[in-house]
C-alpha cells in the first residue's frame, strides 16, 4: 500500500512538473515583452523569444512569402489563368452595364476620378488648341495651300473644279429667271435711266422700259448657256483655283488673322465638347458602347493581363513585398502577435501542454519504481 502511494504521488508530482514546465516554456515564447535588469545585469530569458527575435522573424516571414509563396512566377501563372481573365472581363462588363443603366455622361465619369472636365476644357483645352494651331501656322506658313491640303482632297477638287461652271451658270440662270431677278433688273434699269435721263428719253421713242428689261433678262439668260460664256467662266474659275492652290498660307492669312481664327475655333471646339460631355455616353456613342460590350471587354481584359504580365517584375520591385510584410509585422503589438499565434496554433499548444503532463507522469512513475526498489 505504501509502495502504491509512492508511485501515485511521484506520477502526480511528475505530471504537474512536466505540464507546468511546458506551460512556462510556451509563455516564455511571448513574455516578458521587454528585458528586465537587476542592477546592471539583464535577467536571463528576458525578453521572451518572439519579442527578442521579432525583427528577425518578420524578415524571415517576408523572405519565405516572397521567395516561396507569392513568387513572380506564381502570380504570373495565376494572372494568365482562365479564371483571372474571366474575373477581369466580368468586372469590365459590370462597369459597362452600369454605364448604360445609369445613363452616365463623360462629365460624370470624369468627376468620379476628381476631374472637373468643364474647367479642364475651358482652361487647358483652349490653350492647347490655340497653341497647336499657332504652332502649325508658324511651321507651315510658307507652304502652299495645295501642299497643306490632304492629297485625296486636292485630287477630288481637281477632278470636280470644272463642275463649278455648270453650278454657277445654273444658279445664275435660276436667279435671272426668278421674280427676284426680274425685279433686280428693273431696279438697276431705273437707277441707270435716272442717271442718264436724255438717253432714256431717246429709247422711249422705240421701246418701253419693261421691254428693255425683258430683252436684257432674256439675253443674260441666253449667255448662261452660251459655249463661249461658259468657256470664259471655266477659264476664270480654273485660274483662280490654281492661284489659290499656289498661294502660301501667310499670303492667304497673316499671323494676326490666323490667331483670331485659332481663338474662335478653340472656343467653339471646347464649348461644343463641353455640351457633348453632358450627354449620356450611350446616347452620344451607341455603336461604340455596343462595341465595348460585345468585343472590347475581352480584348481589354487580355490587354490588361498582358501589360501586367510584362511589367510584373517592375511592379513587384516597386511594391517590395518583403519589405511591406516586414514593416507590417513590426507594426503589430506584441499582444496581438501572441493572440494571433495562439489562435492559429491553439490545438497544437494544448497538445504540447498535455504531452508535458503525460511525460511528467511517466517519468514520475519510473521515479516511484526507483524509489521503492533502490
From Swiss-Prot:
The chain crosses the membrane at residues 4-24, 354-374. Disulfide bonds: none annotated. Keywords: Cell membrane, Membrane, Transmembrane, Transmembrane helix. It is a multi-pass membrane protein. It is found in: Cell membrane. GO terms for cellular component: plasma membrane. Belongs to the UPF0754 family. This is UPF0754 membrane protein SAS1767. It comes from Staphylococcus aureus (strain MSSA476).
Amino acid at each position: 500500500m505504501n509502495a502504491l502511494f509512492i508511485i501515485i504521488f511521484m506520477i502526480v508530482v511528475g505530471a504537474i512538473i512536466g505540464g507546468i514546465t511546458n506551460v512556462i516554456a510556451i509563455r516564455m515564447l511571448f513574455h516578458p515583452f521587454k528585458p528586465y535588469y537587476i542592477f546592471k545585469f539583464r535577467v536571463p530569458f528576458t525578453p521572451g523569444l518572439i519579442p527578442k527575435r521579432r525583427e528577425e522573424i518578420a524578415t524571415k516571414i517576408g523572405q519565405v512569402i516572397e521567395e516561396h509563396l507569392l513568387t513572380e512566377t506564381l502570380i504570373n501563372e495565376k494572372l494568365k489563368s482562365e479564371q483571372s481573365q474571366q474575373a477581369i472581363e466580368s468586372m469590365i462588363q459590370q462597369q459597362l452595364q452600369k454605364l448604360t443603366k445609369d445613363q452616365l455622361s463623360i462629365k460624370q465619369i470624369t468627376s468620379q476620378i476628381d476631374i472637373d472636365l468643364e474647367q479642364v476644357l475651358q482652361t487647358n483645352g483652349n490653350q492647347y488648341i490655340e497653341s497647336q494651331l499657332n504652332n502649325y501656322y508658324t511651321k507651315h506658313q510658307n507652304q502652299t495651300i495645295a501642299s497643306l491640303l490632304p492629297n485625296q482632297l486636292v485630287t477630288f477638287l481637281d477632278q470636280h473644279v470644272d463642275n463649278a461652271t455648270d453650278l454657277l451658270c445654273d444658279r445664275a440662270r435660276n436667279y435671272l429667271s426668278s421674280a427676284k431677278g426680274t425685279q433686280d433688273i428693273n431696279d438697276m434699269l431705273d437707277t441707270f435711266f435716272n442717271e442718264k435721263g436724255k438717253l432714256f428719253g431717246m429709247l422711249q421713242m422705240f421701246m418701253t422700259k419693261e421691254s428693255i428689261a425683258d430683252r436684257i433678262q432674256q439675253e443674260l439668260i441666253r449667255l448662261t448657256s452660251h459655249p463661249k460664256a461658259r468657256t470664259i467662266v471655266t477659264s476664270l474659275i480654273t485660274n483662280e483655283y490654281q492661284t489659290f492652290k499656289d498661294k502660301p498660307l501667310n499670303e492667304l492669312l497673316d499671323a494676326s488673322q490666323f490667331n483670331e481664327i485659332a481663338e474662335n475655333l478653340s472656343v467653339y471646339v471646347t464649348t461644343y465638347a463641353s455640351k457633348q460631355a453632358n450627354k449620356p455616353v450611350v446616347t452620344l456613342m451607341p455603336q461604340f458602347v455596343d462595341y465595348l460590350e460585345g468585343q472590347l471587354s475581352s480584348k481589354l481584359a487580355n490587354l490588361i493581363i498582358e501589360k501586367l504580365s510584362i511589367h510584373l517584375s517592375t511592379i513587384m520591385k516597386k511594391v517590395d513585398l518583403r519589405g511591406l510584410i516586414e514593416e507590417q509585422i513590426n507594426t503589430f503589438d506584441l499582444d496581438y502577435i501572441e493572440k494571433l499565434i495562439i489562435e492559429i496554433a491553439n490545438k497544437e499548444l494544448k497538445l504540447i501542454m498535455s504531452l508535458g503532463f503525460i511525460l511528467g507522469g511517466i517519468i514520475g512513475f519510473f521515479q516511484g519504481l526507483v524509489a521503492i526498489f533502490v
